[in-house]
Amino acid sequence: MAIDREKVLQAAQKYVEKKKYDKAIQEYQRLIQADPNDARTLLKVGDLQSKMGAYPDAISTYETVGKLYSQQGFALKAIAVYKQIREIIAKHVPQLEERYGHIAPKLAELYQSLGLTSDALAALDEVATRLQRQQKDAEAIEVFRKIVELDPTNPLPHLRLAEAFSRVKDVEGAVFEFKTAASQLAGLGRRDDALKVLERLLHHQQDPEQARIAAELYLARGQAADGMQALAKLQICFQANPRDIDTLGLLARAFTTIGQAAKAIEVQKEMARVARDSGKTDLFREIVERLLRVAPH
């Protein structure tokens, strides 16, 4: 026998007006039994459950509505419902936060489908932070990967992914992301931040190429201790290839920076020998001319 929808709605409304919410819910349930995909009626049930203080029931009902809206392509409506769930949890039942930890990733997915990248990033950031707090580092890495995909030119997500890799002892992954972050920071003119990241990278792996970049940045900054810092980095490069012209050139600059002119000259002499032995005649002449100006004897 078909249900008289209008009659049921009127009966439910009368119960609501009398604040007999449980009776109203029973009426609405009759409509839902006839049509389990009736999102509007489910939403009314959730609202009444919330008014009654039956927050776990309200959350469960709202989640059903959110899923229906998502399936029906109503992303904005789904987002509103999922946000309502999060507000109820935060305000009334924080102990349910972990059980409904899947809501934030769902929100991120919906935001992304609408092109709302900044909102998606905020939701994913929350997920990653929660996972790290729970020491679920492998799962956090997957979320950080998504953040990097969504915001590839921002150095911060790369840095956070690098640190996440570091926590699980994935040196290769950490070094790659530290390298990317440092390069982006240097490109943005944030030299001091780039150097901090390069120091973290070199702590994980003595990479000659990155050590050279760090040395160049220290020498460009030119503060009192930067010459010594550059020398420390150039030792890595020198050990990897003691006859590399670029490394020798930076070594000469570093010695000059710390006031050791004699050592700078010795390094330039070695540069001249390397240039001569490798057939770089023009470079050899240039170095010799420079040496004759600074050390004619």
Where are these regions (language model features)?
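Repeat-based scaffolding regions
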Residues: M1-H297
